[in-house]
Amino acid sequence: FSQHIIRLECKEYSGYIYCCMKNQNIQTQLQSLIYGAVIQEIEPEHLSRVYIPNAPDSIKAKINDLIMLSYDLRDESNALIDQAQALLVKELNLPPISEIKVDTLDKSKSVQTFNVKLSEMAGRADASYHMPIVDAIVDILKKNAAEVTTVGDERISKSVVLAGVFKRTYVEEEYGYPFLGGKEITQLNPKTEKFLSKAIHKSRYEKELKVTENTVLVTDRGTIGTVALVPKHWNNYAVSQNVLKLIPANNDIAGYIYVFLSSECGGILLRRQTYGSVVDMIDNHSLEMVEFPILKNQDIQKQINDLALQANEKRYQAYLLEQEALKVLDEEVIYAE
């Protein structure tokens, strides 16, 4: 773990301590201990000044068990994704990236050099677009898949939405849409502190920012290619214009899209589309051009898809358990009469 993460070693009821730390009242205490004008931080000794309620053991155990169950579901969700990834690799006969042989002019050199035909330039003069590893991966896909199409194929996606740049107007929670940035899309329960004005941004929200369950999200600048599958509890959230929204053709392909794009080979094909001299980015057209395999065995493709959707459902159930634990803490401890 990073040196910038404080680790609490709990003697018991670690789930209860975790739940307390997530509570808004205790978060306020933590925020009051922050110091630093440029880089804000807290120190381990500051935590000794944070008060948490000493609830009866029965309530501590109840909250602790809910949090532990929530984390068990997260582990099960991750295991399902690993299983789906393994099926994809096996069906496409994908070797580890380090074992894929690529054609370079002089293999003895540390810097790769390679030829590109003028007919294959595709309007791109940047070397990263033409890396030999990309052609090698595509060749493997063509050899082992029934067909290699692109993400923009209407059988794969309805559309890829790139929101325009706009000045954001934030309001209080009751007047706005919950707003997520690219950094939050990998979290189960992002800390939503920003709410876009419904009065000002309604039209843009409906057309470009709104997400629904099983939409595939892809970060399009900065750290390019982080992929997420929208869980049920993010329904109707607004997601930053720095995140592409891939609308699957249907739920029979949504999970499979997520598994492929988040795979090692899928990530290379996706990031290959990167352009920009100062700020690296991809856009909706770039994502639509990413090569995408349709498997020979449709039963395996369906199994991969179903595993991803099951994993997404488990993430939602994990979220509900955590919310229940937070509710118990509020109602039976902090605000108990």
Task: Label every PLM stretch briefly.
Residues 1-4, 36-58, 236-244, 275-300:
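A short glycine-rich beta-alpha junction/loop motif
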Residues 1-2, 15, 28-32, 186-197, ...:
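Short, ligand-facing micro-motifs at secondary-structure edges
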Residues 8-9, 17-35, 51, 262-265:
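Well-ordered mid-protein domain cores that form the structural environment of catalytic cofactors
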Residues 13-18, 57-61, 251-257, 298-302:
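Short, conserved charged micro-motifs
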Residues 15, 212, 255-259, 264, ...:
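Feature representing long, continuous alpha-helical segments
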Residues 56-166, 298-337:
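Non-catalytic DNA-recognition/assembly elements of restriction-modification systems
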Residues 152-167, 183-213:
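Sequence-specific dsDNA recognition surfaces
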Residues 177-178, 215-217:
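Beta-sheet entry/capping signal
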